[in-house]
Curated annotation (Swiss-Prot):
It comes from the Bacteria. One of its GO terms (cellular component) is cytosol. It comes from Azoarcus sp. (strain BH72). Coiled coil: none annotated. This is UPF0246 protein azo1887.
Length: 261
């Protein structure tokens, strides 16, 4: 079973990492190609392209300028510890321990506009490049064209490894719609399950972005702590009061709901 999650805009490069273990991203050559394109952009270009303030645009232009290989612990940080948004609050990776991080390294992947696919312990340098950015490049008009089938091919490689190990070849999609558009479901060599998280508000259940993002991190942690092999075991997920609702779910879309009165 393989899980995919989205990255975060917020980054933490101040807190020391809780592990000395690290790996290097598989798609660094592709990332370097994108960095070369981004280095041709002015702060005004970046502000317009990414809808950023002048201050944030200048920060990211500086990041592109200083981005350099090779990655090492003194100039980069493990991805699962560097991202700092709602998903990562739920995941709380700093308290997973070495065993948890090791399991996550094999079963969890972070989709990235710049790095393509990241393992949790892959070192990364700070950046801002959301998957939906319409950055023109030699492969097409945007990042979906740039990554093409590369991300899907990598996920299929992982699903093949799961199958070879006698485990279920299932991809659990805990990424946002923007990021999962970089995956081509029809080409996946395994079952796809997409959990959704709904909260009760104004007389009905609905997806509330902040809570849903955090729940994706909570479910990732739930699987990591239990080292789950069977996707059916995810139906027992009950963190923060969520519960699986069979009548609202189907084979591929699993609904979890919470009502806080």
């Amino acid at each position: 079973m393989i899980f995919v999650i989205s990255p975060a805009k917020a980054l933490d490069y101040e807190t020391p990492p809780v592990t000395a273990r690290f790996t290097t991203p598989d798609f660094l050559d592709d990332a370097a190609e994108l960095i070369d394109i981004l280095r041709t952009c002015t702060p005004a270009d970046i502000a317009g392209l990414m809808s950023l303030s002048d201050k944030l645009a200048s920060l990211n232009v500086a990041r592109y300028a200083t981005w350099s290989r090779p990655f090492a612990p003194d100039n980069a940080k493990q991805a699962i510890l560097a991202f700092n948004g709602d998903v990562y609050e739920g995941l709380a990776a700093t308290t997973l321990g070495e065993d948890g991080l090791a399991w996550a390294q094999d079963h969890l992947r972070i989709l990235s506009g710049l790095y393509g696919v990241l393992r949790p312990l892959d070192l990364m340098q700070p950046y801002r490049l959301e998957m939906g950015t319409r950055l023109s490049n030699p492969r097409g008009k945007d990042l979906y064209a740039f990554w093409g089938e590369r991300i899907t091919t990598e996920l299929n490689r992982l699903l093949d490894l799961e199958r070879a190990a006698g485990r279920e070849a299932v991809l659990v999609n805990l990424a946002s719609e923007e990021y999962f558009k970089s995956v081509k479901p029809k080409l996946l060599k395994g079952r796809l399950v997409t959990p959704t998280f709904e909260d009760w508000k104004d007389g009905r259940y609905k997806i509330i972005s902040f809570y849903a993002k955090r729940a994706r991190g909570l479910m990732s942690r739930y699987a990591i702590e239990r080292q789950l092999d069977e996707v059916e075991d995810l139906k027992a997920f009950d963190s923060d009061g969520y519960a699986f609702v069979a009548e609202a779910s189907d084979e591929h879309s699993w609904v979890f709901r919470r009502r806080q009165d």
